[in-house]
Amino acid sequence: MTARPSSLAIALSCAAALLVPPVAVAGAAQLEEVAQPAGTVGFIVVRENGSGSASAAQSYLDALLTSLAKRAGWPAASGKYFTKRSKAKKFIEETKPSFGFFSFGAYLGMRKANGLTAMGVADANATGGAQYFVISKSAFTLDACKGKTLASNHADDARFVDVVVSGDAFDLADFELVETKRPVQTVKAVINGEAECALIDDAQISTLATIDGGAAVHPVWASEAMPAVIIASFGSAPAEQVDTFAKHLEALCEGDGKGACDAAGLTAPRKVEADAFAAQQAAYDG
């Protein structure tokens, strides 16, 4: 091939180097030319607004997929970690993964376009997305926040917030929205008086005690609990791969996979019925 490899091809080739024997690689300079083993099963992770390092999360994913491939009898499994749906979309189009790990909003938002079917759920310690809260320093009820400034880094998908997170308790349009980019920035907006209230998740509320001024902030509303991680198959996934993954899904964090799950905070993967989230899907789809 004479064309210069794309940055995506280089990244995938580097990941493949973790999954093939060292004898297949002649040197670091040749990593970009190493092809994925035939039969490699593709994965993607889309964890929106997750805390922690994306590069660390990628290393945990690589280790977990290496363990899964061994357990499932696949030649290899590889995947990529994303924090934005927009960036994940290009990867999906180019690599056509079979499976994914999604935050709940990402799953609902990407489900129809990709033919996603829920296979399981998992807990994710301290990574957020399992419950949402409205917090304030001055207000003591949700109604007292309405019409006031509301900071949030969870407002990218207003539909998810309005029809799933809020449970019809509010719409983002009920507030003067102050969009933030980072989890801690959202909390500090309330502490510093830049916003009257804020919409945060369980990971953010757990950090209040560690942030200067956080003790003065309190929740005025809490959502219902929801799955932190949805494990799903893509519509294009071969049936044989789906059946094999289903057999090993609940053992993801056992054996060689335990260390990667522990490091990533992933716990208790368990199967669900394909229609487990039918109500939320119907609400989101309108």
Where are these regions (language model features)?
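Signal peptide processing junction and immediate N-terminal pro/mature segment
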Residues: 21-30
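Bilobed "Venus flytrap"/periplasmic-binding protein-like clamshell domains
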Residues: 46-70, 105, 128-188, 192, ...
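Short helix-initiation/N-cap motifs at beta->coil->alpha
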Residues: 79-90, 176-188, 225-227
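Extracytoplasmic small-molecule ligand-binding "clamshell" domains
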Residues: 31-108
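Bacterial N-terminal signal peptides
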Residues: 9-22
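A ligand-binding cleft/hinge motif common to bilobed small-molecule-binding domains
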Residues: 101-114, 191-219
